[in-house]
Amino acid sequence: MKKLVLLGAGGFGREVAASILPFMNQRGVGYELRGVIDDGDQYKEGDMIDGYPWLGRQDWILDYKDDVCCTCTIGNAKTKAVIQKSLMDKGVQFATLVGYGAYIAPYSEIGPGSVIYGWTQVSVNCKIGAGVVLNDSVRIGHDVTIGDYTSIMPGTGISGGCIIGKEVDIGGHVYIVPGRKIGDGARIAAGSIVFTNVKAGTIVLGNPAKRMKGLE
């Protein structure tokens, strides 16, 4: 069994340890979770995080990169992008994790270090980048592209043919109509219905979703 560490000791990492990894192990495609690494000043040697040891700061992985792989469990897209890209450039291997009940259709691709939560569905001919998070019960339509390090929260639906950029944060229960383009670094607030393209770096909110310049 391959050995794994989670980078990030917050709620995201603890969810992955508690729900996704046990299911993968039951299927025989899992990992031995060695522990958690996190740069937080509150952690010290000997600390346990929901039953798993805190191993050290993120540079810990550099000394063990030939023996273990890593999954970045940091929710913020931009922070995750900086960390995962830096570690990949240094030869760290990143594992993709898939939860119970998730379905990934044939001819779809998932990049390294992505996390697919339970009951999420990815339709045919989709391209999902590196370090992407698809939370519980997300629905991805056919021929969708999702850029690296984008995070999509529970219950969101992305219709066929949409192109989602890199480092995009999409809240829960969002719906994006077919064929829309969401620019890099955009943020879509929870519950929004997106009928139009969204420019890079902007924040949209509501039904129909409109730009909120005051929040940018």
Residue ranges and their predicted role:
Residues L6-L7, I37, T73:
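Short hydrophobic segments within beta-strands
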Residues F23-G46:
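NAD(P)-binding Rossmann-fold cofactor-contacting core
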Residues K2-L21:
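Glycine-rich adenosine-cofactor-binding loop
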Residues F12, Q42, K210:
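Conserved Rossmann-like nucleotide-cofactor binding loop
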Residues D41-Y103:
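Phosphate-bearing ligand-interacting subdomains
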Residues K3-L4, E32-R34, D67-C70:
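Short active-site oxyanion
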Residues I20-M24, L87:
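Active-site catalytic pocket residues across diverse enzymes, especially alpha/beta-hydrolases
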Residues T96-M212:
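Structural signal for interior beta-strand "rungs" in well-ordered beta-sheet cores
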